[in-house]
């Protein structure tokens, strides 16, 4: 008579324990990263990584959360609703200077590699032809933001004294654009692609940031998230880097994503150039220090922030 092999109770327990350990490991790997983004050209690699399945390819579960304003995005990050976000150099330093443990993990875009991000424009029909001629006239901006910094630097570089720079608050970019184009304000600082749209409709370009290092865009995570998810953070950045390569090698293949996510006006959908993106890299030390110095002069932040505190270079692919 044949006998069946007996499975011992200890072996069953061992198998179950192994399964539990494996499942816990997989659960940790499958943490859903909620990452805040804006409908900005410089965020295109993130949209491409999501749309083309590159996050999944690298084993990362990512949910891109779209915000219409920087303020809304920052509130979500501070509240703990996000693990990270797309940003300029200014905002993370403001948060960090006010006690939020935010870390920059990569620079994604720099005007020195391609073209402008922001510009100061005079209204259609304006007789103002230079930033020097604009001296003392109101410019619509969003205060203590990268567009505020760009506006100030462009004026100063044009020989305008800081004391004579006149600005008016306009947080909503769409409203800022409309009030410029309808002549309700003399000038405004705007981002691309609205700069191109405004020029095509008669606004006059007075200056742009094509040579300013401070106009960088970056990716940030909370330090707590990085501490608990180092490998996941690296794979996230690897997916974004692959998206950069895809965009640069075949820009037309992602035009549909750019048109949809960046909300290009109808007149630009077929002709606006797809940006080229540099390799992911740490933010420029000099540019970051310049931003910190500007924020301290404005008394927006008061504490000293070292580059090594604000940046983690160890996660780059």
Segments (PLM) and residue ranges:
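Short, low-complexity disordered leader/linker segments with a strong preference
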Residues: 1-32
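Short, glycine-/small- and polar/acidic-enriched structural segments
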Residues: 28-160, 167-170, 179, 186-189, ...
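Conserved H-loop
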Residues: 61, 161-162, 265, 301
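Pocket-lining segment of extracytoplasmic ligand-binding domains
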Residues: 90, 164-258
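Secondary-structure end/capping motifs
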Residues: 228-302
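Conserved C-terminal helix/tail region of periplasmic/extracytoplasmic solute-binding proteins
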Residues: 296-317
């Amino acid at each position: 008579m044949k006998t069946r092999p007996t499975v011992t109770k200890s072996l069953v327990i061992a198998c179950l324990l192994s399964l539990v350990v494996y499942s816990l490991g997989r659960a940790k790997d499958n943490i859903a990263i909620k990452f805040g983004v804006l409908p900005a050209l410089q965020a295109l690699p993130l949209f491409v990584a999501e749309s083309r399945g590159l996050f999944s390819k690298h084993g990362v579960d990512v949910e891109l959360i779209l915000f219409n304003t920087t303020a809304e995005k920052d509130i979500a990050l501070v509240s703990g609703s996000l693990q990270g976000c797309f940003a300029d150099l200014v905002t993370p330093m403001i948060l960090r200077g006010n006690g939020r443990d935010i870390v920059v993990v990569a620079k994604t875009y720099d005007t020195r590699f391609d073209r402008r991000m922001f510009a100061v424009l005079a209204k259609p029909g304006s007789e103002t032809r230079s930033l020097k001629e604009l001296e003392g006239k109101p410019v619509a901006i969003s205060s203590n933001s990268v567009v505020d910094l760009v506006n100030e630097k462009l004026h100063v570089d044009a020989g305008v004294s800081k004391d004579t720079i006149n600005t008016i608050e306009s947080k909503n970019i769409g409203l800022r654009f409309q009030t410029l184009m309808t002549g309700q304000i003399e000038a405004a600082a705007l981002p691309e692609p609205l700069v191109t749209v405004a020029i095509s409709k008669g606004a006059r370009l007075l200056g742009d940031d094509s040579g300013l290092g401070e106009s960088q865009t970056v990716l940030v995570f909370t330090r707590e998230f990085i501490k608990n998810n180092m490998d996941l953070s690296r794979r996230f950045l690897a997916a974004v880097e692959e998206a950069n390569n895809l965009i640069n090698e075949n820009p037309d293949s992602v035009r549909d994503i750019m048109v949809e996510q960046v909300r290009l006006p109808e007149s630009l959908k077929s002709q606006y150039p797809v940006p080229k993106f540099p390799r992911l890299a740490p933010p420029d030390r000099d540019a970051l220090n310049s931003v910190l110095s500007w924020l301290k002069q404005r008394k927006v932040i008061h504490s000293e922030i070292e580059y090594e505190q604000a940046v983690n270079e160890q996660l780059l692919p």
